[in-house]
Amino acid sequence: MNGLPAVKGFIETGFVDWAGKVASVVFLPRCNFSCPYCHNHRLVSDPESYRTFDLDEVLERMEALRGWLDGVTVTGGEPTIHKELPSFLKVFKERRWKVKLDTNGSNPAMLGELIDGGLISAVSLDVKAPLEEIPYRRNAGRGADPCAVRRSLELLARSEVPAELRTTVHTGLLSVAEMARIITQTSEIFGCYKAIKWQACQVSDTLDPSLPKNGASDRETLSRLVLEAEELAKTSGHLTEGGPTS
């Protein structure tokens, strides 16, 4: 469809992208972040090397699975950099599909428009680091603005749209103390303890090929780091079992 973002990847049925849902996955090109551990970097730097899926084909393949699919996850890249994103999502909503948006939170104005327009049923927002300039730009690139990410989190905290927060852990890029600050900062924004989906960093085929391989955590190590961070957040005096303290 003319004027809409190009679809550069399509998974007909996904079981892990939207918790508790069976959803198709649509990939949009380009991104305004440059995370060193990004494994979709060719979708960002060279999207023309990927096939473009006709949106009508995507819709037809989804329609054939109606009754089995719950909806579609729109991911990237970073979907919110596309000014035509609201019109793109309307195509799915008009066909009675629920939409989950994956975002880095860098465009709160666009996120607010999507929320106000009823165009998204859920959001997964990637929190790259504590909401502070130095660690955020280290983990997401020099153009990353943690203040914009904070505004996106505040929008989600005020809305009724279910929000999942995700953080990728590479021990060379994120310390336990920084993980603890992510916990306290996001919990303060949401007014209660906000669970985070911690993800081990996959170090094969990353944007930064020099990213140390030993920074990737296995499941056991990641669980230990998360427990340490949660305990540190509690002992810091900023987080209690019932939520953040004033």
Predicted segments — roles?
Residues 54-58, 110, 225:
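Hydrophobic alpha-helical segments typical of transmembrane helices
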Residues 41-72:
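Conserved alpha-helical substructure of the radical SAM core
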Residues 1-16, 20, 173-246:
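Auxiliary Fe-S-binding modules of radical SAM enzymes
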Residues 42-49, 136-143, 210-216:
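Short glycine-enriched, charge-decorated loop/helix-capping segments at active-site entrances
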Residues 18-53:
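Canonical Radical SAM [4Fe-4S] cluster-binding loop centered on the CxxxCxxC motif
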Residues 5-11, 30, 43-44, 57:
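SEC14/CRAL-TRIO lipid-binding/transfer domains and related phosphoinositide-recognition modules
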Residues 27, 75-76:
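A secondary-structure boundary/capping signal
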Residues 59-71, 80-207:
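Conserved AdoMet/S-adenosylmethionine-binding subsite of the radical SAM
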